[in-house]
């Protein structure tokens, strides 16, 4: 009798994706983040669903409804903080996942990589809109500042901003539509994840060496299911430690004040995971230039396959590229730090230098170093 797992039309798809999938035998813990991102998405959708049952998207009651969730709903505080800190875990996993892709040359799978970059954009948009929903001071002013950036687009900018706002300022219409989009986007993300996996399974996974591993594959289950479960436990441990011991560690105290259009907070800043992009935006004095730099700081990821000039795929055997990669990581940490600082000396110049270095490393230094390493191979 044939196995149902291999013949049933629906279970067969799951079997080929998570059970009998041939996987390289040498993939390290850096390959765990895909499954962890799936877990993060599931946590966010579930906690978000329960929050949406009690939340009201009206400027008069939004802040109170979040307070009500935390005080009166059974385990509402837990659901709310799991959702807020779950977003932070989501972005930590995202950054590590993208970093892994850059280090080991996974971007040579064009379709998988490009869908991944689109996913990054959509997740960032979703997180931004979610941050607006509690309707605290930072929610309101963050929404005002970031949506206002679109006014830098020539000719249609101002009209576009008013169209997004649904009026002449961030108000009830803006909050309602942000809630609607914040609810629907995670499901669009889930659909894009399916496409991401579809393209990945066309080629098979990359591995640390960057070499073709078809001659040495092992089944995904039980080897990598067990390995993923370890990652899952570690992620939940970190998330729940954060949620139960210091849930507001990564948040902004200003968001515990209800939104007030008449009082601007001293330092408007986004959540920590957007600070690097915010620092790049602020480091350019021109509004349109800043917006372009902001968009290009993420969009530049799509150029990596074109800028890959090395004869080797992975950085595993390329010490010079490794060195530049870690300088880039340090630069991103610097940008994140600067994004949270006030706009004054010496932070302005540090931010500008870090922004220039970010683009120079990616566009010039990494490709140049790759060519040098190609020459060194002939020694």
Curated annotation (Swiss-Prot):
Membrane topology: Multi-pass membrane protein
Alphabetized GO MF terms: metal ion binding; ubiquinol-cytochrome-c reductase activity
GO cellular component, one term: respiratory chain complex III
Keywords (A to Z) from UniProt: Electron transport, Heme, Iron, Membrane, Metal-binding, Mitochondrion, Mitochondrion inner membrane, Respiratory chain, Transmembrane, Transmembrane helix, Transport, Ubiquinone
Principal localisation: mitochondrion
InterPro entries, alphabetized: Cyt_b/b6_C, Cyt_b/b6_C_sf, Cyt_b/b6_N, Cytb/b6-like_sf, Cytochrome_b, Cytochrome_b_C_euk/bac, Cytochrome_b_N_euk/bac, Di-haem_cyt_TM
Effect caused by changing residue 360 to T: In strain: Isolate S60
Subcellular location: Mitochondrion inner membrane
The UniProt record lists the keyword Secreted: no
SUPFAM superfamilies recorded: a domain/subunit of cytochrome bc1 complex (Ubiquinol-cytochrome c reductase), Transmembrane di-heme cytochromes
Cofactor names: heme b
Gene Ontology process terms (BP): mitochondrial electron transport, ubiquinol to cytochrome c
Superkingdom of the source species: Eukaryota
Residues binding a ubiquinone: 201
Residues noted as binding heme b b562 in the record, renumbered to the chain: 83, 182
Transmembrane segments: 33-53, 77-98, 113-133, 178-198, 226-246, 288-308, 320-340, 347-367
Pfam families, alphabetized: Cytochrom_B_C, Cytochrome_B
Cofactor note: Binds 2 heme b groups non-covalently.
Biological role: Component of the ubiquinol-cytochrome c reductase complex (complex III or cytochrome b-c1 complex) that is part of the mitochondrial respiratory chain. The b-c1 complex mediates electron transfer from ubiquinol to cytochrome c. Contributes to the generation of a proton gradient across the mitochondrial membrane that is then used for ATP synthesis.
Miscellaneous comment in the UniProt entry for this protein: Heme 1 (or BL or b562) is low-potential and absorbs at about 562 nm, and heme 2 (or BH or b566) is high-potential and absorbs at about 566 nm.
Homology family: Belongs to the cytochrome b family.
Subunit and partners: The cytochrome bc1 complex contains 11 subunits: 3 respiratory subunits (MT-CYB, CYC1 and UQCRFS1), 2 core proteins (UQCRC1 and UQCRC2) and 6 low-molecular weight proteins (UQCRH/QCR6, UQCRB/QCR7, UQCRQ/QCR8, UQCR10/QCR9, UQCR11/QCR10 and a cleavage product of UQCRFS1). This cytochrome bc1 complex then forms a dimer.
Protein name, as recorded: Cytochrome b
Source organism per UniProt: Urocitellus undulatus (Long-tailed ground squirrel)
Upper taxonomic lineage: Eukaryota, Metazoa, Chordata, Craniata, Vertebrata
